[in-house]
């Protein structure tokens, strides 16, 4: 005979893998062309000058320079620019 009761089953124990979203390079920091600035879902932050946007809304630098965040336009949207290195 079994000396212990059989272990019950559970319906828990699953979770999705984290997507590592967020700001990767902050304002004032240097960045190389092609470097990722922000990984995001949707356009929480918009691409500004010298910044490109990937199909998953990732913002990346088009030129070497420094990152600069700014709010502008209708509704004070947040933009990120890359100021080219002198």
From Swiss-Prot:
Keyword 4Fe-4S: no
Alphabetical keyword list: Ribonucleoprotein, Ribosomal protein
Compositional bias segments (type: Gly residues): 1-10
Pfam families, alphabetized: Ribosomal_L27 (PF01016)
UniProt GO MF annotations: structural constituent of ribosome
GO BP field: translation
Spans annotated as Disordered: 1-21
Keyword Ribonucleoprotein: yes
InterPro entries on file: Ribosomal_bL27 (IPR001684), Ribosomal_bL27_CS (IPR018261)
Gene Ontology CC annotations of this record: cytosolic large ribosomal subunit
NCBIfam families: L27
Family that this chain belongs to: Belongs to the bacterial ribosomal protein bL27 family.
Xref: PANTHER family: LARGE RIBOSOMAL SUBUNIT PROTEIN BL27M (PTHR15893:SF0), RIBOSOMAL PROTEIN L27 (PTHR15893)
Name of the protein described by the UniProt record: Large ribosomal subunit protein bL27
Organism: Ralstonia nicotianae (strain ATCC BAA-1114 / GMI1000)
